[in-house]
Amino acid sequence: MPAAPRRRLAFHAPFGPPDGATGNLQEVQDRFVDLSRYTAAGGLASRPDDRTVRVLVGRKGVGKTIYLRRFQASASDEDSVFAADREADPPATEDVLRVGQLFDNKTVTETWQLIWRRAIQRSAMSQLLCLPWLRDHLEPEVADRLRLDFTGLVPAARTPRPVYAEVSDILGGVHAAHRLSEHLKHRDWADLEYWLGKALRDAPPMYLYIDAVDDHFQRAPMYWLKCQKGLFLEIMRLLQSDLGRRLHVVVCVRDLVLSSVLRSEHGSRYRRSPHIRLLEWDIRSIGYFLAEKIRRLGAAFMLQPSKSGIEGWLGRTTIGNPARGVEEHVEDYLLRHTRLIPRDVVDLGNALCEQVAELKAEGARSMPDDRLRRVVGDVARGFADEQIRVCANQIASDQVPALGGRDGSADYFVGSHEYSDGCAEEVVALLEELGGDRFGRDAVERLADLGHERFGGHQHIVDVLWQNGRLGHDSMEPRAEHAHFYSPTGADSFHLPADKDSYVLHPCVPHRVRLRHVGRVPVRGYRRP
């Protein structure tokens, strides 16, 4: 009986579900494209039994949740360690905004680091005291000290408490900066850490897993960045502490967080850390991912089953580009319209498979140009719309007035669909004024000036577009036919480089914004292999 839902999933989503947070883990594992033997894959080649990983970094849709679920499942199968369930219920954005406005830029990251430290300690303590399997390992004196001596700092818990719940509890209990600082820096925390260390030495190694950052991050990116940066720094500090020998916390953070850390004065210590895994897909790894997804398709989704790869799937290897007067390889055409992430490839693959099934029923052996372009355009429009809305949310959250997190006015900027929708339409209108998908330095300066004017003094619309992968620049290498978009490890990653001759919009943007294609060379954010 359990096989029926799987057959329905296979028919409706031949490439699999796009969201790794949902679905049966075994199905996710079965559909996982393993890159552990792919030598050029970097963090993507991480094995599920690798216990050295502490931070998974990447954009939305790169697979952070799938990797974290695999790490957690592997650890939970090991009898000698305790692996908590994956946490997926972050604190409210309103709480994150409030902390960002209670403290200035010089102290907010340090404050977040302390919040995460106390929340992790409280969560670990609740696990040790509330789970009989762990509690039985503790000396009676240690258990009594933890349970009785710190009720002023840590409310009694009857069940194991997730880290996220402890963060929300800490933030919900105080509404003034000095009160929060007093709580976080109370002298009794040192005593609690001492007894917690003794408890952890007797108990099995403990692994905690913190996920679900993407959906909340995009509501107020710069505020969540500071929150996650504090989490990142605390995880790396914990790794070097005595507690970190027995307490292991594995987290997911956004690429912008790593970019911010690497730009700090201590960035070099993290650049090649074996405990940080950057899930950064390039054209080779995402091409391999696409090829594997095609290889696993059944004959029902292959227009020419006797052939392999793109040709077997869609019945063709090239497609005309009438706007530029060139022919493109189909694989190149498909991938350049994505953000080079698995989620986009899965979305696009499922949409194309639906058309393949219809064409097979009609007896066709290849997908016509116009049909292929229409499907790609429809899916790319969705990608562009999502990212434009993320840009609009970032602009809106940057406009939250001082103290907005305390007086409730922040909801107008980050909780109002009407306001964010208006910002998104304004971004579209600004992009339309560029006229084309390729333009010069003067057009970028004009875009920045118009953004400043229309968004009430907002200074950084070009940087917001750059950080979200919508705006890039053509390579200045001789005879190059590729563009550069944001990379978290780039030295200038937070700001659009101002010294380039030619700038471009991502290929999905013209499917959402009325723009003409400029030049014969299609925009692609990678160097073709």
Task: Identify the residue ranges that each predicted region occupies.
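Short secondary-structure boundary/capping segments
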Residues: 98-103, 224-226, 263-270, 352-355, ...
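Walker A/P-loop-proximal flanking segment of P-loop NTPase domains
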Residues: 1-102, 517, 521
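C-terminal leucine-rich, beta-strand-based interaction scaffolds used for sensing/assembly
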Residues: 86-88, 325-529
